[in-house]
Structure formats: structure tokens, C-alpha cells
Amino acid sequence: MGNASSIVQTINVTGDGNVFKPSAETSSTAVPSLSLSPGMLNPGGVPWIAIGDETSVTSPGALRRMTSKDIPETAIINTDNSSGAVPSESALVPYNDEPLVVVTEHAIANFTKAEMALEFNREFLDKLRVLSVSPKYSDLLTYVDCYVGVSARQALNNFQKQVPVITPTRQTMYVDSIQAALKALEKWEIDLRVAQTLLPTNVPIGEVSCPMQSVVKLLDDQLPDDSLIRRYPKEAAVALAKRNGGIQWMDVSEGTVMNEAVNAVAASALAPSASAPPLEEKSKLTEQAMDLVTAAEPEIIASLVPVPAPVFAIPPKPADYNVRTLKIDEATWLRMIPKTMGTPFQIQVTDNTGTNWHLNLRGGTRVVNLDQIAPMRFVLDLGGKSYKETSWDPNGKKVGFIVFQSKIPFELWTAASQIGQATVVNYVQLYAEDSSFTAQSIIATTSLAYNYEPEQLNKTDPEMNYYLLATFIDSAAITPTNMTQPDVWDALLTMSPLSAGEVTVKGAVVSEVVPAELIGSYTPESLNASLPNDAARCMIDRASKIAEAIKIDDDAGPDEYSPNSVPIQGQLAISQLETGYGVRIFNPKGILSKIASRAMQAFIGDPSTIITQAAPVLSDKNNWIALAQGVKTSLRTKSLSAGVKTAVSKLSSSESIQNWTQGFLDKVSTHFPAPKPDCPTNGDGSEPSARRVKRDSYAGVVKRGYTR
């Protein structure tokens, strides 16, 4: 049967001697960060075996997949399997002829960590009679000598000894047992977290304390009636002690108090020192900053040579516009009938059902030139607009998207005869109510949508122009004097690209982009009018990641140099020595340092400044290249240090939280006082509570044991 010894500790949840003294060095942690992504667990390869002893493994077909039938019986019956939770003995586990797979050390380590995570709740699982014996992944593994590889050709040069292998059935059975236990722990884990957050059980720095009996009284007073902690108080006490070294229970039988937490390594990494933030925090922040820089691809966004559009493009993001407020010469994807055209003209179009619709065109009417638009979704919202006139009430009226085709440019239209074909692709009916202001009628939220895809229009004639208009339509003729609006573009137009790889530059679709040439090449107006998939917007999105990385890493203030601003300073120092036109100004290093720092701070505040011509420093592509490459170098050469200001600020902030926490716990001990030695008690040793009747007594002992 084997040798075993047990240790039994007897605790009294409401008794004397228990300790509640959270500290930064004993902060509670129980979250197992498992790395179970497919890319980490696989591929470990598969085991291969030679067909015969006399056959050379280099011969064609000399290796075959190893199966469970190839494992000796002595290896199948794993004598080390003493847990029995998921037994590997052939009498208990289905012993079918299955292919074997190699298990990586990464998988073994993570499944073992998952087993450890379950044991935080061992006493509760025993109470439920779930997973009554601790699982042990290693008991399901068999170690064999074999060739290892994903293919036979790879395996023939990779013979290994003592390779851990497992069958799919055993692997599935093991994971199912872990999942069943986790399912049983769902509400239990929530209730434990409620108990740990109902009052402060952690402190960012230093130490705080409160009488444990006061803490227990507060929990008894405030926990929900259906909390599992009420039903299983003793098991909860043990589980909390394992998570938080500041919660300690006295062993009644021995009169000793011991720290039962199992997270000493993690807790120490989470605790700050006397002069520095926690090691875990510094590591995580540096990792985040480096991930952002990697995602931005500094080499791509600073390239001086063309980059293919699909490489430079980012996942498309919607952009909002008010078409009526965009300058036609900036928004090159718009067209407009000149305002000087005097007489409006009416046209009649149909929709896909053959219904006839009437609409008016006049001077000032605007359309989207679909020939300059990549596949796009248009959504127009007139919500909040009025469009009311003396003889025109928008309530009940219809607005629609109309697609035109004509060989005559839109800005030259003066009559319906100049239009080739037109169709209503979608329309909605408006609902409007009188505004609080006189003579206005506010339109409710609308969603007039159209998905434009060039293939729908059968563009075979290169001389044909295609346009999209949004305006009022009606089944009867619309009197021009009643409805005088040129269109309904005075609304919120949301444009969402339907393709990810297409890029435009100022309204023109391009096949490649020179990123460095984008720097300082847009006016604020042209940037505002650029399409959602414009190269400038792609550049700004990538540059924003650089700015965010700098913000995470850099705590320098305005006019202060830092590792991330000095790349600009170095470029400025050289550029002022270069021969050029005009009067050269030589700035000393102190001035250059401030100029570089201010440029970096402006970039962090608004990354789009690198694109617009208004930026005094970073609109120069040389300064931008220096910054993009310098930030990458700065982060790659950084250790686990923190900025001076960051360290001081975090420590002083942590001390303020510590003081607040202790003040709160002092109030807990005041309003839920622990019984004094001379206070009368009930028969079970607990103090009578005038506040409420106890629904579930915490009094009693728990015997906690484990084998070794």
C-alpha cells in the first residue's frame, strides 16, 4: 500500500490568535497564468519507429508512426501512478490502438501548474467529493526511445531517448477531469473573491492590520445569504490563507500561527521596494512598450523606399465626415455642381423593384466620386438635423442613396438629359418632431446604408463616371421652391472600407507608398478630408503605437531630455551644420535638447502632427526617422529600471493608499469590535451579536490534512 504520513492542523475560525495583517510582501495571488495557446503546445512532433531491425532508417518507408501497441506492457502499467485520479493502468484506461503524440516540456509544465491551481481549493473539492484525488499529468505519460518529428523525413535524423508520449484518449480524459473541477469551482471562486474585496485584503506598500474577529464579524454581516462561504466557512478560511499570507490561522492544538500562503515567489515580485516599483510591474510595462513598437514596425513607417500598399495598410477603421463642410479642392473624392448654376432641374429614377422616384438637382449639390473610392460601406445618419422649411416638413419624407453613371462630369450637369443612368440603391423614411426652437424640426436617428463594390457596376467603359448622391426622393414630383436643400449630406456620414489591402493617397488609389514622404505632406484640411484607408491615416495609426510606447516608458517632462527625445536632438545637431539656403542658426545643446523634448511631447499628445505641415520639427522626415529608430533602440537597451519621477510618484501614491486602508480597517475594528476577555460569551465561545442573528455560525474547527 505504500508509506504515508499525515499532518493535521486544527483551527478555530472565530477564536483568538488568528491574524489579519496584509502586507505588500504577502499580497494575494491565485491566478495561474497558463500558456496553452496552440502555437506553444504544438507541434511537439510524433514518435516514429523503425519497421524492422535490419532496415536502414534512411530507406524509403523505413519509419512508421508509433502507436500504443508499440509500448511494452511494463511501460503501460505505470507503477509511479499512486494518485489514481486519472489512472494509466490498462484495466482502467481504454487501451485501444491509438497513435501517440510527443508532449513538450512546455505542455507538461503548464498542465502541472493547472493542477497546482486546483489545490488552492482542495478542502472545498473534498467537501463536494469532486476530484477526490489530486490529478497528476505525469502519470499519463509514457517515456519511450523513438525517432521524433512531424514527418518521417524529419524524424530519421532525430532519434531521442526517454521521450514523453501520450494517446489522444488519455489527453482528452485528463483535460475533461480538470474542466469538471473548474466547473464545480465557478461560484466558489466568485464568493472567495467577494470576501477578499469586501474589505481591503491587500496593500500596495508596507503593512496594515485589523483584529481577525472584527473581520469575521464584518463578513458575517455583509456577505450575501447564498454565499458558499456561509455554508463552508472552514474550507473558505483555509483557501484564503493559501492565497494571502496576511491571513493566518492559529493551530489550536499547538498554539502556533503559520503563514500558509503558497505564493511567496509571486508576492515578492509584486511588492515594491523602499525606492522602486514592483519588479513585475516594471517587467510588464517594458514588455507592453516593446510590443507596441514591434506592432508599429519602425522600419516600415520610416522607409525611404516604396512599400507595397498591402504591407503598409492597417486593418481598416471607420471614419466620420460631414460632406457639406469638406473643401472640394481638399476632398478630391467629392464633386459639386457649381453654385452659379441658376435653375434647378428635376430627374426621375427607379429602384430595383421598378418603382419611380423623383428628385431635384441644383447648384451646390455634392456627390461622392465612386471612381476614386475603394470598396466602401456608407452609413448616413441625419439624427439631430432639421431640414425644415416653410413649406417643407421632413417628417415622413424619404431620403435615399442614388448611384448615377454618365460620361459627362458631374460638375458640368445642367439638365437631366446629361445623365446616362441612375438608380435608387436604398432609402429610408424620416421621423421628425418639432424642436424647442421656432421653425425647426429635429430628425430622429437614421441609418441609410449602402455597400459600394465596383463589381456591382460592371465598369467596362473607361469614359463612364459613377457618382453617389444622398438626397430627398418622392414618388411625386418635388417642387423646387418647396425643397431648396441641394442634398442631405449635412449629416454624419460614416465610411468603412470593405477591403483591407487597398490604400489611397489624397483620394487616389495607390499600389505602393513611400512612408517617409508622407511626413509633413498634408494640411489639416486635407487630412480631415482623407479617406478612411488613406496612407496618412495608416501612418498615424502606426505612429500612435510609438507614442503610446514612449508614454509608458518615459516620464520626462517638457524641456527635459530623455532617451526617447535625444534621437531628435542628435539629428537637429547635425542638420544645423549642413549647408543650405538662408541664414543658419546655431543652437547650443541646451536649446536643442529643449526643442527635441517639446517635439516629442507634442508627438505624444497628438501623433497626427507628424503628417501635418504645421509641426515645426517632426514634419521633417529626417527627425521622424531618428525618433522612430531611436525609440526602438531605447527600449531594447533598457533593463528593468523605472523613471525617477515614476518611482517617486508610485511610492508616494502607494503610501497614501496604505494610510487609507489602515484607516478603513480601524473603522472595521471600531464598528465590529472583537470580544474582550471579560465579555460574556455564548456556549460556543462567540460574542452575542446585537446587530443581527447569525444565519450560519463560524464557530468550530476544521481538520486540514494532506499526505506526503
UniProtKB/Swiss-Prot annotation:
Domain remark text? The C-terminal region, phi, determines both targeting to intracellular membranes and induction of apoptosis.
Q: Which GO terms describe its cellular component?
A: host cell endoplasmic reticulum; host cell mitochondrion; host cell plasma membrane; membrane; viral capsid; viral outer capsid
Q: Where are the transmembrane segments?
A: none
Residues of the region (Disordered) are: 674-708
Gene3D superfamilies from the UniProt entry? Membrane penetration protein mu1, Chain B, domain 4, Protein mu-1, chain B, domain 1, Protein mu-1, chain B, domain 2, Protein mu-1, chain B, domain 3
Q: Where is the lipid attached (N-myristoyl glycine)?
A: G2
Q: Where is this site: Cleavage?
A: N42, P43
Organism, per UniProt?
Reovirus type 1 (strain Lang)
Q: State a single Gene Ontology molecular function.
A: host cell surface binding
Gene Ontology biological-process entries: symbiont entry into host cell via permeabilization of host membrane
What Pfam family does this protein match (any one)? Reovirus_M2
SUPFAM superfamilies in alphabetical order: Membrane penetration protein mu1
Modification comment: Cleaved during the endosomal proteolytic disassembly of the outer capsid. Mu-1 is proteolytically cleaved into mu-1N and mu-1C during the maturation step to generate the ISVP. Cleavage of mu-1 to mu-1C is dependent on myristoylation and binding to sigma-3 protein. Mu-1C is further cleaved into delta (59 kDa), and phi (13 kDa) segments during entry into the host cell cytoplasm. Mu-1 and mu-1N are N-terminally myristoylated. This acylation is essential for the membrane fusion activity.
InterPro entries referenced in this protein's UniProt entry, alphabetically: Mu1/VP4 (IPR009113), Mu1/VP4_sf (IPR036256), Mu1_membr_pen_domI (IPR015961), Mu1_membr_pen_domII (IPR015962), Mu1_membr_pen_domIII (IPR044937), Mu1_membr_pen_domIV (IPR015960)
Q: Which gene encodes it?
A: M2
Q: Which family does it belong to?
A: Belongs to the orthoreovirus mu-1 protein family.
The protein's UniProt keywords, in alphabetical order, are: Apoptosis, Capsid protein, Glycoprotein, Host cell membrane, Host endoplasmic reticulum, Host membrane, Host mitochondrion, Lipoprotein, Membrane, Myristate, Outer capsid protein, Viral penetration into host cytoplasm, Viral penetration via permeabilization of host membrane, Virion, Virus entry into host cell
UniProt-annotated glycosylation sites, renumbered to this chain: N12, N81, N110, N458, N482, N528, N659
In Swiss-Prot or TrEMBL terms, this protein is called Outer capsid protein mu-1
Q: What is its quaternary makeup?
A: Heterohexamer of three sigma-3 and three Mu-1 proteins.
Task performed by this protein? Major outer capsid protein involved in host cell membrane penetration. In the endocytic compartment, outer-capsid protein sigma-3 is removed by cathepsin proteases, which exposes the viral membrane-penetration protein mu-1. Both myristoylated peptides mu-1N and phi are released during infectious subvirion particles (ISVP) formation in the endosome. They associate with host membranes and mu-1N induces permeabilization and delivery of transcriptionally active viral particles into the host cell cytoplasm. Seems to induce apoptosis in the host cell.
